[in-house]
Amino acid sequence: MYRFAPSPTGDMHIGNLRAAIFNYICARQKNMDFILRIEDTDKARNIAGKEEEIKEILNLFSISWQHYYIQSENLKFHRQMALKLVSEKKAFACFCTEEELEAKKELAKKQGKAYRYDGTCEKLADIDVLECEKPFVIRLKKPTHTMKFTDFIKGELSFEPENIDSFVIMRTDKTPTYNFACAVDDMLENVTCIIRGEDHVSNTPKQEHIRASLGYNKAMTYAHLPIILNEEGVKMSKREAHSSVKWLLESGILPSAIANYLIMLGNKTPCEIFTLEKAIKWFDISKVSKAPARFDLKKLLQINREHIKMIKDDELNKILDLNKDLAPLAKFYTQEASTIKELKEKMQAIFNAKNFGEFETECKILKELLKDIELFENYEDFKNELLNKSNLKGKKFFMPLRIILTGNIHGPELSDLYPYIKNFIHELARI
């Protein structure tokens, strides 16, 4: 069982989408179920509407799930599991205040040591715990042995008990911490493999320790994906526009192109242009590079152009939404436009009213002739016919003609454009 477990706290990051895609691919390859779990226990940071947005984005990428969970709905199980650990003396109530802990952290900092919980409340007698009326958290006792696990990308990893520490699993408001809720949910939902970003590596031994303490002995496998760097080689920030999947989609980049690029990023693929369905046949999670991958927007745009060309004409016409059969013309314009947004702008420039500027007179002459001109198969025949009838020459012929046909003074060679624009010439002459 594989899962994707986003939080509804902001726009979906491309790193999260990459994890979703990889989990989905591996689930399909292993013929296993795929879980979508919304981790919404951080109520203060949750944003209304983001849960639905996550589902909408996954649907756009053709990522389907067999099971859907809301983490906060498992709260009763989180509390039951925490109580079980306390009753078995594997966890304990900690009454240390934030101020007390902060003072100890400052002292450790001054001494040049890493702060570790000193066990102040671990050995409190039961009667002392019962009689104490202060707010408390629940801490899981640190493991007594080295925690080891295998990562498909990073290999064998191990963590010593002192580096895991006795960590908090339940807050004073009786809600679970991220690691506890995540570990319990993975256990309850029979997750067998976790693919996520490498920023979660330090969480893995804690989650392994939680499940082991609860007597869960089913093996879990992992793959921690390297971080995505920006074009300057620095970890990509959520503040950078193109780190947002929503921004990429709104910019006119196709879901299929984004998926193609994210699968290829930091990975050796048998070909450069492919679909998600094709990738399922050959993708190997263990072949993903350990090194951070640098995001290249230009490369993504190049891939997007290829995916636009791959779209069926009727589907592209629906996307362009101009009530015309413009797909062949739009695909021709991928030499200048890299996104659906840019293509729409190109098409609108062609089919909207135009500013003729200094060529007002010449454009009027040409438009009258173009209304009924014979649409020759060959551009040279078309051009010569129009030259002869208009008596215009050079710049005063070609510039006005380009404006009428494209709405711009610059663009592709008219001879190259002609086969794609030919059937619209009579219409353009009447705009």
From Swiss-Prot:
Superkingdom field: Bacteria
Enzyme Commission number(s) of this protein: 6.1.1.17
Residues annotated for ATP binding in this entry: K238
Gene3D superfamilies membership: 1.10.10.350, HUPs
Catalytic activity: tRNA(Glu) + L-glutamate + ATP = L-glutamyl-tRNA(Glu) + AMP + diphosphate
EC category: ligase
Keywords carried by this UniProt record: Aminoacyl-tRNA synthetase, ATP-binding, Cytoplasm, Ligase, Nucleotide-binding, Protein biosynthesis
GO BP term, pick one: glutamyl-tRNA aminoacylation
InterPro entries given in the database record: aa-tRNA-synth_I_cd-bd, aa-tRNA-synth_I_codon-bd_sub2, aa-tRNA-synth_I_CS, aa_tRNA-synth_I_cd-bd_sf, Glu-tRNA-ligase_bac/mito, Glu/Gln-tRNA-synth, Glu/Gln-tRNA-synth_Ib_cat-dom, GluQ/Sye
Gene Ontology CC terms: cytosol
Subcellular compartments: Cytoplasm
Sequence motif 'HIGH' region, location on chain: 6-16
Main subcellular location of this protein, as a coarse class: cytoplasm
Pfam families referenced in this protein's UniProt entry, alphabetically: Anticodon_2, tRNA-synt_1c
Gene Ontology terms for molecular function: ATP binding; glutamate-tRNA ligase activity; tRNA binding
Motif residue range(s): 'KMSKS' region: 235-239
Function field: Catalyzes the attachment of glutamate to tRNA(Glu) in a two-step reaction: glutamate is first activated by ATP to form Glu-AMP and then transferred to the acceptor end of tRNA(Glu).
Oligomer and partners: Monomer.
Similarity section: Belongs to the class-I aminoacyl-tRNA synthetase family. Glutamate--tRNA ligase type 1 subfamily.
Entry protein name: Glutamate--tRNA ligase 1
Species name: Campylobacter jejuni (strain RM1221)
